[in-house]
Amino acid sequence: MKFGFVIVEGFEDKTSTAEHTLRRLTEVEGEVEYRTVPGVAETVLAAKCFAELTSVDAVLVFLPAASTVEPAVLTTTLDGLTNIVLDWNMPIVTTISYPDGAQLARAAVTMVNMQIEMENKAEGRMVDTSVN
């Protein structure tokens, strides 16, 4: 498994527990890819770049505590991240839902494993839903 870390500037120290847990739970291929962004809203573009331009299996987003972020910015950011999940089938987990790094890593691994299992079961059973 490969993972991308999107980190809001100033929160780089929050990643070590998550990375340690990922390495303990999985066979991480190569290094975890890190991208640091200047603010909360910029995490959306970084996560989209991971989904669109790399081969990572999931993205872990390290955000400041919800109480320290302007509510409109946080809502817009989480909406943007959710859209990436839906558009790209890319598991994205955030420190808003999982403030503990180990929990964050476990959630990412759980979602990747679920996605792999569901994709494997669906192979050969895909229904064409296109309209003529």
Predicted regions and their residues:
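A charged, well-structured terminal subsegment
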Residues: 102-132
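Glycine-rich phosphate/diphosphate-binding loop of Rossmann-like nucleotide-binding domains
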Residues: 1-34
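A short helix->loop->beta-strand "cap" motif at the edges of active sites that frequently abuts
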Residues: 87-91
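Generic secondary-structure signature for well-ordered alpha-helical cores
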Residues: 23, 27, 49-52, 82, ...
